[in-house]
């Protein structure tokens, strides 16, 4: 399953790469985050409840802002509600800088 949102210029893709792992690519900004959130709720809902690890690999994210970080926080909340463990890999430098300045770096489960 692949989730694609936004115009060609701001397309965001979430593609499964392994069991419970997803590759995220594109632009995560105020413009794209709401539609990515809506699509990802459906995607996360298709995973079985409880006990499953979820990993989002953000290596393919080309640009992000604070809305991208907010999206990660929402994914964390949703995973916790579904009793799943979530981790993030390869956070873009912009997102890591925003998380650090916001004091959120320590709560992000990164590998």
Region locations from a protein language model:
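STAS-typified acidic loop motif
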Residues: 4-41
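Amphipathic alpha-helical interaction surfaces in cytosolic regulatory modules
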Residues: 27-107
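Short acidic-hydrophobic, aromatic-tinged amphipathic segments that line or gate anion-handling sites
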Residues: 109-111
């Amino acid at each position: 399953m692949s989730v694609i949102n936004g115009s060609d210029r701001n397309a965001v893709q979430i593609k499964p790469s392994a069991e419970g792992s997803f590759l995220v690519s594109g632009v995560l900004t105020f413009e794209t985050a709401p539609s990515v959130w809506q699509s990802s709720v459906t995607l996360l809902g298709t995973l079985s409840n409880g006990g499953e690890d979820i990993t989002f690999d953000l290596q393919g994210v080309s640009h992000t802002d604070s809305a991208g970080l907010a999206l990660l926080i929402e994914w964390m909340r949703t995973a916790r509600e579904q009793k799943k463990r979530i981790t993030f890999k390869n956070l873009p430098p912009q997102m890591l800088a925003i998380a650090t300045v916001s004091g959120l770096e320590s709560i992000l489960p990164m590998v």
